[in-house]
Amino acid sequence: MVVEYIRYDIDAGRAEAFEQAYRRASEALDASEHCERYEVTRCSEDPTQHIVRIEWDSEEGHLSGFRQSPEFRRFFEAVGPFVHDIAEMRHYQVTLSSEDQSRA
């Protein structure tokens, strides 16, 4: 499993449109065999900052599977207008989780 974090800087006047776009895009994520979980969050201290967190089965599943699929085209159709608002987009490996602690 790999976690993708996408940090957006969205003008206040476009925040509702951004969240609506991700609601539409979520249908494509739900349909993907590679997407395990996702969430869209807005910073409470600075509402122009949003983070999208997507758990993928693997980096390859995301980059070679999802991005080559019809689901990606539907996903990008919805969120494409916000691509220039991306401040950072990276993949991370989980090194510690509360789920790990509960199994100990």
Task: Give residue ranges: language-model regions.
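Glycine-rich beta-strand-turn "strand-cap" elements at beta-sheet edges
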Residues: V2, E39-I51, F76-A104
